[in-house]
């Protein structure tokens, strides 16, 4: 439960649900003295216990089952145990150059680090450098309107309104109504994540609504909202995506962080 009031006349009461059921399975080979792990394929969500209802329609078939808005923790734990054991017999990846195909359960981290943090305007301005440093996506690149952040097929957006997402709320911690906006459009850098006291720098009159404090006693400041890769125009299966990859690695889940 979050209650917000300010001297401008805002009185906002929000009931916010968040859940992240998580685990790590460790398989030990006592003869070799080695161990392998496999983490859960769950996701942090803006949902309640209904996320654990394990509905069949939320299961995504593949080399391992992945999950949408409902998660089967027992099924995933059993698969994790088997796959952790299988990793003991797996070959190491040979050094070299590979094409990568990243499942959303892994891609989220790539987006978080390579797009989310660099496009936090406080890092761009040098106000913040904790953990993820400052940013290469400087204001001159944005002002040029031609900085290629990614391939022209790539569209990335920020929001705090996707139903069921971890960052979804009605209003941020400055009392600003949340919304969605573009960060990268057709591969070009078009915007940042910014709050009320930063918007004049971007020539905008309205905050993006991504201000956050982790506690009533903490000072709220600009924090990363949901940052997402927009789907492509073609609805491709994994098999269709990888059929043209001659030397590549397909990654599901994350075994480490940045």
Question: Where in this protein do the model-derived segments appear?
Answer:
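Short linear interaction motifs
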Residues: 4-5, 78-82, 161
């Amino acid at each position: 439960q979050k209650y917000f009031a300010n001297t401008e006349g805002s009185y906002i009461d929000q009931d916010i649900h968040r859940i992240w059921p998580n685990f790590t399975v460790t398989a030990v080979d006592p003869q070799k003295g080695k161990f392998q792990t496999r983490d859960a394929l769950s996701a942090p969500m803006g949902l309640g216990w209904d996320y654990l209802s394990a509905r069949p329609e939320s299961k995504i078939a593949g080399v391992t089952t992945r999950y949408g808005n409902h998660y089967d923790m027992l099924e995933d734990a059993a698969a994790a145990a088997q796959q952790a054991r299988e990793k003991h017999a797996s070959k190491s990846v040979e050094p070299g150059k590979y094409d990568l195909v990243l499942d959303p359960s892994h891609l989220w981290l790539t987006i978080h680090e390579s797009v989310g943090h660099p496009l936090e305007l406080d890092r761009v301005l040098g106000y913040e450098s904790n953990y993820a440093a400052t940013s290469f996506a400087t204001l001159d690149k944005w002002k040029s309107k031609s900085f290629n952040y990614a391939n022209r097929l790539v569209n990335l957006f920020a929001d705090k309104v996707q139903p069921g997402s971890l960052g979804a709320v009605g209003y941020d911690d400055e009392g600003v109504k949340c919304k969605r906006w573009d960060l990268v459009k057709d591969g070009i850098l078009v915007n940042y994540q910014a709050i009320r006291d930063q918007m004049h720098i971007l020539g905008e009159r309205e905050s993006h609504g991504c201000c956050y404090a982790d506690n009533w006693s903490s000072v709220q400041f600009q924090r990363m909202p949901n940052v997402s890769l927009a789907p492509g125009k073609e609805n491709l299966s994994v098999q269709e995506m990888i059929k043209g990859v001659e030397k590549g690695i397909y990654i599901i889940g994350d075994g480490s962080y940045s």
